[in-house]
Amino acid sequence: MVKAVAVLKGDSPVTGVITFTQEKEGAPVTVSGDIKNLDANAERGFHVHEFGDNTNGCTSAGPHFNPHGKNHGAPSDSERHVGDLGNVKTDGNGVASVNISDKSLSLFGPYSIIGRTIVVHAGTDDFGKGGNAESLKTGNAGARAACGVIGISN
């Protein structure tokens, strides 16, 4: 089993800790944790971005992790970036409890997400259905509220 963790922070008050686990190569990755200080009763875009570089805040994390050159989509779509995890939903206190199982992510091999950045966005992901070029790249999810580099853990 491989485990990883990311501590989310940014220029906004949004914070969180997200864990990633994968039993074996080829198995789904479980993504879990809590993200706090988001807008209440909202859906916010949640993606793995290409780089583990946060030297210029979340902006330097680059675009969504997309090693296969596909358009942006929903987690259930065949046409999606590897890093497209959809939206996290917040409760009345602005807390999103994350519990995702994703078969496209990996903690093994050349497409591993370890060393990349997980980002929670300030807007809702439209799953590439927004009818414009930006939707096919980012899902129109907006600014990067918080992010963290995904690091191997024990």
From Swiss-Prot:
Alphabetized Gene3D superfamilies for the sequence: Superoxide dismutase, copper/zinc binding domain (2.60.40.200)
The UniProt annotation places Zn(2+) binding at H64, H72, H81, D84
Q: Which residues bind substrate?
A: R144
Q: Which Pfam families match?
A: Sod_Cu
Query: For this protein, what does the record note about how its cofactor is bound?
Result: Binds 1 copper ion per subunit. Binds 1 zinc ion per subunit.
Sites binding Cu cation sit at H47, H49, H64, H121
The set of disulfide-linked cysteines is C58-C147
Q: What class of enzyme is it?
A: oxidoreductase
Give the highest taxon in the source lineage: Eukaryota
- Quote the PANTHER family the UniProt record gives: SUPEROXIDE DISMUTASE CU-ZN -RELATED
What family does the Swiss-Prot or TrEMBL record give for this protein?
Answer: Belongs to the Cu-Zn superoxide dismutase family.
Complexes and interactors: Homodimer.
Protein name, per record? Superoxide dismutase [Cu-Zn]
Question: What organism is this sequence from?
Answer: Cryptococcus gattii (Filobasidiella gattii)
